[in-house]
């Protein structure tokens, strides 16, 4: 049964891959949103981008929550096709909150000069929760605090990286405040600390 399901998923992924290749030329910007948990952090950035551009999303989980015609989602289940998608990607920019580019099946494309931009899903120390080579292959890494900015510059110098840090707002906080505006501030702070602890433990 498991073998049959794997074969079915493989053929479904091939169809999805073909659809992706047909549509890809209509996009400059893409997001790799690995799962629903990461979507919580990337959605504010996706929403911002779709105000001006069409956005392509690559995911490993079903994320059918967007009602926006500017968003096209491609969901892949099998690792072979997932890696093939990354290796053949033809975009100008790919945003993600998944680290370890080139250290897993998440690879840089061989078919374009795509720029890879890392967006933070945690405000904690970069040295504390990530592998030492987690950001080696990104062209730009978001920092959402002065401490993260200094940390990445230290990492960059130590590992002789070409990628640059950039400061920007942590849009997840802004979105969370908006969604939880009816709750007392103490509950909001507790909730944010709890989510931060979850990220750290993962």
Where does each model-flagged region fall?
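Conserved catalytic-core segment of nucleotide-activated headgroup transferases in glycan assembly
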Residues: 37-49, 171-202
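Short, charged/polar "capping" segments at the starts of alpha-helices
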Residues: 38-41, 62-68, 103-104, 149-152, ...
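Residues that mark the start of a beta-strand
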Residues: 26-28, 115, 188-189
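An aromatic- and histidine-rich active-site surface loop
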Residues: 38-39, 96-111
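A short, aliphatic-rich alpha-helical micro-motif
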Residues: 87-89, 135, 183
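N-terminal pre-catalytic "stem/leader" segment of glycosyltransferase-like enzymes
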Residues: 1-90
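Active-site-proximal region of nucleotide-activated glycan assembly enzymes
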Residues: 71, 77, 93-97, 112-175
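Structural motif
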Residues: 31-36, 58-62, 96-100, 120, ...
């Amino acid at each position: 049964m498991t073998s049959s399901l794997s074969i079915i998923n493989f053929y479904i992924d091939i169809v999805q891959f073909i659809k992706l290749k047909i549509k890809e030329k209509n996009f400059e910007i893409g997001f790799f949103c690995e799962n629903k948990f990461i979507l919580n952090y990337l959605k504010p950035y996706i929403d911002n981008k779709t105000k001006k551009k069409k956005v392509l999303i690559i995911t490993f989980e079903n994320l059918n929550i967007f009602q926006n015609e500017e968003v096209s989602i491609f969901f892949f289940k099998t690792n072979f096709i997932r890696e093939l998608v990354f290796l053949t990607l033809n975009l100008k920019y790919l945003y993600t909150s998944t680290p370890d580019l080139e250290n897993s099946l998440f690879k840089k494309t061989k078919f374009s000069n795509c720029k890879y931009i890392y967006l933070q899903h945690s405000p904690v120390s970069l040295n504390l929760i990530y592998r030492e080579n987690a950001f080696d292959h990104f062209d730009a890494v978001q920092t959402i605090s002065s401490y993260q900015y200094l940390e990445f510059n230290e990492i960059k110098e130590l590992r002789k990286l070409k990628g640059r840090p950039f400061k920007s707002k942590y849009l997840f906080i802004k979105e969370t405040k908006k969604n939880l505006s009816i709750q007392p501030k103490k509950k909001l702070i507790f909730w944010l600390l709890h989510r931060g602890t979850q990220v750290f433990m993962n």
